[in-house]
Amino acid sequence: MIQVLLVTICLAVFPYQGSSIILESGNVNDYEVVYPRKVTALPKGAAQPKYEDAMQYEFKVNGEPVVLHLEKNKELFSEDYSETHYSPDGREITTYPLVEDHCYYHGRIENDADSTASISACNGLKGHFKLQGETYLIEPLKLSDSEAHAVYKYENVEKEDEASKMCGVTETNWESYEPIKKASQLNLPPEQQRFPQTYIELVVVADHRMYTKYDGDKTEISSIIYEIVNTLTQIFRPLHIRVALIGLEIWSSGELSKVTLSADDTLEAFGEWRETVLMNRKRHDNAQLLTGMIFNETIEGRTYKSGMCNPKHSVGIVRDYRTRRHFVANRMAHELGHNLGIDHDRDSCTCGANSCIMSATVSNEPSSQFSDCSLNKYLNYIVRYQSTTRCLHNEPSETDIVSPPFCGNYFKEVGEDCDCGPPANCQNPCCDAATCKLTTGSQCAEGLCCDQCKFTKKGTACRPARGDWNDDTCTGQSADCPRNGLYG
């Protein structure tokens, strides 16, 4: 059983509250000061891990008490995660660090169904949380009092550049492409219209400009990337996509592919490097270049649309424009969205927020939600183009998960029948969120051959025909949709 650590935060208001202060996120005009004070609920004398599996924080925001629930993100790293950097003479140095007891968490605010949180607890509390529709950031204050933290709204951070930023992917003409089809129009029964579980094993590369920008501090660069991917995993979870960091590379001795003012040329060169070099030494599904280059034409990122799983095109480049990790994570999620066949949003697309992830114009306050258009486009893409996205269906072995099984992390592990997330978030009637077991009378909880918690009747089509191949059909004995391999 997971022990819960209770942490009380006492809110103090100081004379300089509301004045301007320079933080890692930039110049902040209005903030509150809090002092985290741990009050442990672990039994007296019990061994306390360095970073607990679950924590709660109580504090006030705008004078109102909130309770922040955090759970360690046990999907952050893939099994054979590695880190690579280069000696001054260009020699490759690869290590396999132990990452089980890391300090990166996801969470939510109690009694706020739409809340989210992505927090690093490595050195104090650092990250962001969404409360009542507004994004707040928290980070330690670099004062003589090391316990002081600042809490502030994202909108109160002064913008470095108010110029409109754009995604580098060419704006598509929606009418010129295959129309987006609603889930109900994909010739799939209702129970199969849920997103299939897919997996992206991700490599993030920091270029040499990033290395020099952070004064050669590889630890700092690694922490930045951890924070970005921690947010990525949360963003893609509603699509049933597990994003796991399988590799981190820092070009410490110089650029290994051409990085120029042209985003197109930089993307092409990085794709060629991935195809000819990286794929030969590291198994992965997608690679993203995080660069310190300021591209021409206010380009924030560039990628190949529908390039996922392609040796050269399953790549993206993202500019490390700000020190705000949430902003950069949003940009990387945007480029990954294009890799997954998702177009820019039209004006009519909505996500319940001021901006959505696939907006063509970069918002100063990044979104963490995909629009209704994006969800439909992704579902259409993943169902109709399975033959070109097979890398996404390589489910990691349940025995290869880095950390011990953890009910409530959305990932089915050894000893579990299903995992639909925390009880407050579970929407699967076939799965008991408290135990990660099937509910009484259920045969299955998900899968292309799972119909209202029962195995679909034998012979039911579960995957459309591909070229000269027949439809794949259910066996009646499993929720999986086997590849029949029969010519028509």
Curated annotation (Swiss-Prot):
Q: List residues traversing the bilayer.
A: none
Q: What SMART domains does the annotation carry?
A: DISIN
Tell me the residue numbers annotated for binding Ca(2+) 1.
Answer: 201, 285, 391, 394
Q: Which Gene3D superfamilies match?
A: Collagenase (Catalytic Domain), Disintegrin domain
Question: Which prosthetic group or cofactor does it need?
Answer: Zn(2+)
Task: Pinpoint motif Cell attachment site by residue range.
Answer: 466-468
Tissue-specific expression: Expressed by the venom gland.
Q: Peptidase M12B domain: which residues?
A: 198-396
Return the cofactor note field: Binds 1 zinc ion per subunit.
Sites binding Zn(2+) sit at 334, 338, 344
Keywords assigned by UniProt, alphabetized: Calcium, Cell adhesion impairing toxin, Disulfide bond, Glycoprotein, Hemostasis impairing toxin, Hydrolase, Metal-binding, Metalloprotease, Platelet aggregation inhibiting toxin, Protease, Secreted, Signal, Toxin, Zinc, Zymogen
Residue positions assigned to the propeptide: 21-191
The UniProt entry annotates the active site at 335
- Give the highest taxon in the source lineage: Eukaryota
- Going by the record, the broad EC class of this enzyme is hydrolase
Q: Which cysteines are joined by disulfide bonds?
A: 309-391, 349-373, 351-356, 407-426, 418-436, 420-431, 430-453, 444-450, 449-474, 462-481
Q: Record's family?
A: Belongs to the venom metalloproteinase (M12B) family. P-II subfamily.
Q: What is this protein called?
A: Zinc metalloproteinase-disintegrin 8
Source organism per UniProt: Crotalus adamanteus (Eastern diamondback rattlesnake)
Q: What is the lineage of its organism?
A: Eukaryota, Metazoa, Chordata, Craniata, Vertebrata
